[in-house]
Amino acid sequence: MATPYYIPEERVPLPPKDAEVLSTACDYCVVACGYKVYRWPVAGGKEGGPKAEENAFGEDFPVSPLGPWIAPNQHNIVLHDGQPHHVVIIPDKDAKHVNVDGDSSIRGGAIAKKCYNPQTPTRDRLKTPLIRIYGVLMPVPWDFALDIAAEVSKHVIKAHGANAYGVKTYSYQYMENTYAITKYALRHINTANFTFHDTPSDVSSTPGFRDAGFDNFAPSYEDWRDAETLLICGTDPYETKTILFTQWIMKGIQNGQKAIFMVPRRTAGVAYAEKNGGLWLDVTPGTDLLLVNAIAREIVKNGWEDSDWIKKWVNNKWESSSGFGQGTRNTPWQWRTTWGLFQTKGFEDWKKWLMAQDEFKLENAAKLTGVSPEKIKTAAQWMAKPDKGKRPKTSIMIEKGFYWSNNTGNTQAISALGIVVGAGGRPGQVIARAGGHQRGGLRGGKYPRNKSPIKVPGRRRRALDTDAYLIAGHTRLAHVIGNTWIQSMCGSQGLAKRFDELVVANPHQVRSFDKQDIIDTLKRRADSGGMVVYNQDIYLVDPIGNRYADIIFPAATWGEETFTRANGERRVRVYQRFYDPPGAARPDWWIIAQLAKRMGFDGFDWKDSNAVLEEGARFSRGSRKDFFMVKVAAKREGKTLHQKLAEFGTDGIQGPVLMRADGTLEETKRLHDTARKLPDTGPSGANRFNKKLTHFNSQTGKCNIQKSPWSLFSDYWEWMRPKGDELWCTSGRINERWQSGFDDRRRPYIVQRWPENWVELHPDDAKARGIENGDYVMVYSERVPAMKDTILGVEPKDFSFSELMKNGHIELSKAAITAVAMVTPAIKPGVAYMDFLHTSQPANALAGRVVDWISGNYNYKMGVGKVRKIGESPYKDSFRSMSFAPRDIA
């Protein structure tokens, strides 16, 4: 049987001396390594030669292994100004920041293959607007598609209200786009039926960080390197943020850093840490809170807390309650920090609470978490025990495997642990997220929380749960932009079933080529209780586009427009356009602007992407990536904002950005920098001194230390806990694939390595089920819980999982996916691990569609199911595709 294979090119052209050189950054993970783009015409057959004076690198070829060589996956042919051009895209060897060694991950290293080229698998890029007529997506002109969309949109808003217009969009795909989208959805439509790609509600992903006063991306990458002890929770940076690990954390480990990983599987990063004296806390899914608080308990029991830091930087109750006035605490962080369930009177009160909880005692926590008491003690010692009177410099890094497991509880617990060990705004002593995607959000409107129908106990509104609202039949128009809504959400197969009912099964289907007939048909569908779907994307996504969308808008992406974005240390950079988008594809800001103008909205008359960014710049003020003063500098110099940002090349400029008295720009290495001195005279000109520059994000500028009750989550965990022959089914990233694999599925090299979905099983679990490497298995559940109502809470218990079950607000459904078994001792017994977003077989189908009722986020990593063999895959006995070799090696 044939399996996917890859035959690499044997020859790659060198750029000639006169090749154009542009700067960009990788389009994938949060690190955003800097890249150089070399571009020259195909016409004439011109290429660089092997001698230094003959090529753009100024190097004699062959070069040393670390020199600027070009791999086959770093070359492509694109159209520029309508003519074929070579492009070579390689890491910037001269970068002074981020990828300082000029290296790349396997993902970024092949980014040239992302570019549209009809001779490659990218040939299926969307090139023209499409409308579904007689069940078939048919090409139509822009005006035709936009006119129809605008008329239907206006009707839905007028007839059913703004909340009937749902917008599900990315939060990161460049500031020019996110500003336009949020201006349209939040400022003009003013819908509360709005959220981003990775959550059902527009809420903070890390509520505990927000409550404590920590910014998600406060540190510089130097801080991760310079920590003496680094606790990494819920991620392996090597697998997910490779350059952050290899060029920063790894160097710290080589210099003696003690790295502690809190994850249920032993990956390459964990193996490297252990080999170099590190520690693996092999936590059972969902029990992170118990483990974190057990470590904290050991620290305070022994008096190892950073008492000087705590005395100076931790609020007492009067301070945490101060500054709110006499109104209600409707803002989520306000009511959480003043609610007795979380709020404390300060450190001593928190300590008293912590020591009184039986579940945090060493032996009890060890039993549920599966982490030995010895490991818990070791972690506490490394993080906090002074050595000859000197405290260790400890930092804490968290990511999705941690905060998507018990969202509010875990982030409250880890924030308190960070405070206890003095992880704040000091070199090598920080606490933050590692990051997933890059930071391209720029808000053009404020979320209208007062329009959300979801009320939690007290006079408190929570952002609308877009999944539950849709399932209840209230969403009459779903506008989906650049994400895989359905597979990316929990209980995804149940969500797909509801899309089928509202869209496909509705009798009002377009069966006419007449514009007015199409408009009238889609209006009737919305009025009948059905749903209309618009989709903007670069590829036809299944099923949101391929099966459900009535109108498809083709988008231009990385390299096809000049865009701006920040990375995980707040470094703002311009991503220069270097080739033409396919067909009639246009950037999302343009699509939104055309739709908005047809709907009668003002303020969308932008001539280019720079105009969008210049308008949006003032909305960056006060944010972690504040770049408004760069715009001020640009105007003083007679330049556009894009031109000014381009001057910083691949290094970019680290926000928030200030302007000195002499007009030069000042960057921010880290937020919460307690040693930073700002002018006593205060900000001058258009400068704004964000509190987070030198203090924490609370009313007083100090940290809030809060309780993290296990009881808020324990009933859900106990119910989900595997029964009989079930396993925990959790998920995450794999090094070679990014997000949904939208680019990776079009790279033969990656498809050969990962041709299908896979599931890791421990040898003991596999043996008990008669499963071997390469077997096809079914992973299934007969009890996937899902919230079926939007309810108004009166008492706190109304939203507890056990109470929701008792009162009939939870329905159970079945789900199943298939995968290729990978048997490995790297995964903890009792746990199965899968790709988090393999679109054809989504792991999220097995995760409960029940939000954390306090934050509104899903606990994506909390799936459960059974596994059984259904046959043998062609990869079981073939060594050409899908290796089963161990990955936890160092």
Language model segments and positions:
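Active-site phosphate/pyrophosphate-binding segments
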Residues: 342-462
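Short beta-alpha connecting loops at secondary-structure transitions
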Residues: 276-282, 554-556, 570-581, 746, ...
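N-terminal export/assembly segments and adjacent metallocofactor-ligating motifs
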Residues: 1-304, 316, 330, 345, ...
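Long, contiguous, secondary-structure-rich segments that constitute the structural scaffold
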Residues: 588-641, 740, 744-890
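Extended redox/cofactor-interaction regions of prokaryotic respiratory oxidoreductases
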Residues: 179-251, 255-262, 269, 290, ...
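Glycine/threonine-rich phosphate-binding loop and adjacent beta-strand/alpha-helix elements that clamp
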Residues: 559-581, 591-596, 823
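Long, well-ordered, tryptophan-enriched scaffold segments
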Residues: 270-389
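Glycine-rich phosphate/diphosphate-binding loops that line cofactor/substrate pockets in enzymes
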Residues: 145-165, 220-229, 353-357, 377-395, ...
